[in-house]
């Protein structure tokens, strides 16, 4: 990893990335795509060491409290977060200023900060967003080798449910010929319903492949599933959207089950829920901080 002094932190949508790059090693990672123009190796994580100070300045400049969310490009709970505590320090400042917090992660390291999420949620609002991809433990360790499995993330969701902290799941990607089975999707959905998630984000039964991420994904397929990359090339050529042959049936299953259990399943509805601040905490007085 290497350290930088960032010039700014929050996007116009109040999103932030504390780290740039990732060491989780997910074989399908879209953030490896060349369009993102990384100037350093993806695993050489860039650390925005002044992020907590930038966040505090940005919050002090706002007249109203809002939800502060981490981006999906780089998980805020990198292994180095154990020592650096950037995410934790940002959460402490979010709590102090009465803002809301939403974090998207695949790591059970988020449990370290559950007390902070609890306090923020009691004062304003916090939402944990967690990615679930595959119910099979062995396959999960192949596809996402350096982070906890989806089954372990389910346990995290249950713990947040116990604290009555809202959760949203990203059910993506579903990999053609690997995880795009009815059995896998149904198991993941059952976990979501059992954990009381508010919404499930699913853009389709498939994944996206671009220059940079496609080559990395195919090399992983060649290592672990010989011949499968050839099947992808024959089926999809260089397509960006790579949908499962069972896409339509799986999406019908997804929407039907979510409707039955009263769970948000339109991505825009999920995003609106995440971004909405409770009316009683939307107005911020900095003199209370």
What are the roles of these predicted feature ranges?
Residues 135-137, 144-146, 159-181, 204-207:
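Conserved strand-turn element in the central/C-terminal portion of the radical SAM core barrel
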Residues 84-87, 118-130, 179-196, 221-224:
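Short, electropositive alpha-helical surface patch
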Residues 1-129, 133-141, 150-154:
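Conserved Radical SAM active-site core
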Residues 68-69, 104, 167-171, 200-204:
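Short beta-strand segments at enzyme active-site cores
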């Amino acid at each position: 990893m290497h350290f930088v002094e960032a010039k700014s932190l929050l996007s116009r949508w109040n999103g932030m990335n504390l780290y740039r790059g990732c060491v989780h090693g997910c074989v399908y990672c879209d953030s490896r795509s060349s369009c993102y123009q990384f100037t350093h190796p993806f695993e050489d994580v860039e650390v925005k060491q002044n992020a907590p100070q930038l966040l505090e300045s940005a919050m002090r400049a706002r007249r109203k409290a809002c939800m502060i969310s981490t981006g999906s490009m780089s998980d805020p709970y990198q292994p180095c977060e154990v020592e650096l505590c950037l995410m934790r320090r940002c959460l402490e400042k979010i709590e102090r200023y009465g803002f809301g917090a939403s974090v998207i992660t695949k790591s059970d390291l988020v449990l370290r900060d559950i007390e902070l999420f609890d306090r923020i949620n009691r004062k304003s609002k916090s939402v944990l967003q967690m990615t679930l991809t595959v119910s099979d433990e062995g396959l999960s360790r192949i596809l996402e080798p350096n982070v906890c499995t989806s089954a372990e993330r389910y346990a995290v969701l249950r713990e947040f449910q116990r604290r009555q902290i809202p959760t949203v799941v990203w059910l993506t990607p579903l990999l053609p010929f690997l995880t795009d089975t009815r059995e896998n999707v149904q198991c993941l959905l059952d976990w979501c319903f059992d954990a009381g998630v508010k919404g499930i984000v699913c853009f389709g039964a498939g994944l996206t492949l671009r220059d940079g991420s496609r080559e990395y994904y195919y090399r992983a397929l060649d290592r672990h599933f010989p011949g499968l990359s050839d099947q992808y090339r024959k089926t999809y050529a260089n397509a960006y959207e790579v949908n499962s042959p069972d896409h339509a049936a799986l999406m019908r299953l997804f929407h039907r089950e979510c409707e039955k259990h009263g769970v948000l399943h339109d991505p825009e509805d999920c995003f609106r829920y995440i971004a909405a601040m409770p009316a009683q905490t939307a107005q911020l007085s900095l003199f209370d901080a």
